[in-house]
Amino acid sequence: MEHLTLGPLTRATGTVRLPGSKSISNRVLLLAALANGETRVRDLLDSDDTRVMLQALRTLGVAWRQDGPDYIVTGAGGNFPVKSAELFMGNAGTAIRPLTAALALQGGSYKLSGVPRMHERPIGDLVDGLRQVGAVIDYLGNEGFPPLHIQPASLRIDAPIRVRGDVSSQFLTALLMSLPLAQSASGRIEIEVVGELISKPYIEITLNLLARFGIEVERQGWERFILPAGTAYRSPGEIFVEGDASSASYFLAAGAIGGGPVRVEGVGMASIQGDVRFADALNRMGANVMAGDNWIEVRGTERDDGRLHGIELDCNHIPDAAMTLAVAALFAEGTTTLTNIASWRVKETDRIAAMATELRKLGAVVEEGADYLRVTPPQPWQTPADGIGTYDDHRMAMCFSLAAFGPLPVRINDPGCVAKTFPDYFSVFAGVTR
């Protein structure tokens, strides 16, 4: 197996220009494809997940081209030209879930599949929501999971659509992004969220981007969303993709652990991404944080020993970036407890179990529950002979690069898995650490 040995590292300082946000990139691509008009997308993330979406759109007959670093998407006006297709979605949840909803409105026959892990990631709540309005969707494997077969159907929306919000916010995002194209006798469509809605900041990203494409959604708390029916999406002409706030977390944590200053550019106080609030968590752990509209900078703690201190944090607002805190906890005095992270279990891997397993290899004392993780730093540090497993999960690999600030080298297995969102992560990380 390919591996990469890092550290021990003692210092982090420098500036990083972030790659585009995965969450924003794939939303923008689909909205641009559904819109009327041509959209120039600037700073689109170049990664496995965006390539999956781009290839799917091309298969569906959507025209796009590159113009230097930009992508120009010619919208299909809500109607994909190709009415029968088989689409391979890799392990891109941000692609398969919104596309499932969009394709259910197309009146065509589509099969969607992915890698084996994708076939273990739930999609049943979204399918249930679409079936409520007449969509015909069959499971080709296990009930509630991809692969799927979407068949021609005429959707009828005459009552509120109910969807669970406690497994993944992507189900709600998928409905919000597609249902404005549907018809309703009342001229509006209501979505009711059943249960506690997790990862609310990702819904805020969706609502913000819908507004950029001319769709205004009325939000009544986090329980009810009212959309205009039979609406055409309008291209904004040009749209910029923010830097990825989840990817920013690794460099900001490096600044906190390795002294800093480390500055990330591409996200800041003006960001629409909830994960920028990761910097607040570092501040609570004792790091020094500064920020502008489009940048964040972190330095280490003022303590003589340079150590952070453990915290207890409800992570519902930063579900992806919270993973970085679990590794940063190795360098904190006391115990760090991360709660409200049940969504980790249905991501690229079961991230609670994976994180607990790999932290224990380094000597940490870890307690895991259904929706929490409690981490106490190693006494003493250990270095696993078999390295750190990454589970084909980009965020596991990037998180554990921070373990190289410990007193022993750390071996990262399958470092190439970062290609999902940040192909050159390790070279960028090397540029700000020593």
Curated annotation (Swiss-Prot):
List the catalytic activities from the record.
3-phosphoshikimate + phosphoenolpyruvate = 5-O-(1-carboxyvinyl)-3-phosphoshikimate + phosphate
Has the keyword Amino-acid biosynthesis been applied to this entry?
A: yes
Enzyme Commission (EC) number: 2.5.1.19
GO molecular function per UniProt: 3-phosphoshikimate 1-carboxyvinyltransferase activity
Subcellular location as annotated: Cytoplasm
Cross-referenced Gene3D superfamilies:
Enolpyruvate transferase domain (3.65.10.10)
What is the main EC category here?
transferase
The entry's keywords: Amino-acid biosynthesis, Aromatic amino acid biosynthesis, Cytoplasm, Transferase
GO CC terms in record: cytoplasm
InterPro entries reported for this sequence: Enolpyruvate_Tfrase_dom, Enolpyruvate_Tfrase_sf, EPSP_synthase, EPSP_synthase_CS, RNA3'P_cycl/enolpyr_Trfase_a/b
Question: Catalytic residues per the record?
Answer: D320 (proton acceptor)
Q: In which pathway does it act?
A: Metabolic intermediate biosynthesis; chorismate biosynthesis; chorismate from D-erythrose 4-phosphate and phosphoenolpyruvate: step 6/7
Residues annotated as binding 3-phosphoshikimate are: K22, S23, R27, S168, S169, Q170, S199, D320, K347
| The keyword Hydrolase is annotated on this UniProt entry | no
**GO annotation terms (biological process):** amino acid biosynthetic process; aromatic amino acid family biosynthetic process; chorismate biosynthetic process
Superkingdom, natural source: Bacteria
Pfam families the record matches: EPSP_synthase
PROSITE patterns, alphabetized:
EPSP_SYNTHASE_1, EPSP_SYNTHASE_2
Q: Where does phosphoenolpyruvate bind?
A: K22, G93, R121, Q170, R351, R395, K420
Subunit structure of this chain's protein: Monomer.
Q: Which family does it belong to?
A: Belongs to the EPSP synthase family.
> What is the role of this chain?
Catalyzes the transfer of the enolpyruvyl moiety of phosphoenolpyruvate (PEP) to the 5-hydroxyl of shikimate-3-phosphate (S3P) to produce enolpyruvyl shikimate-3-phosphate and inorganic phosphate.
Q: Under what name is this protein listed?
A: 3-phosphoshikimate 1-carboxyvinyltransferase
Q: Which gene encodes it?
A: aroA
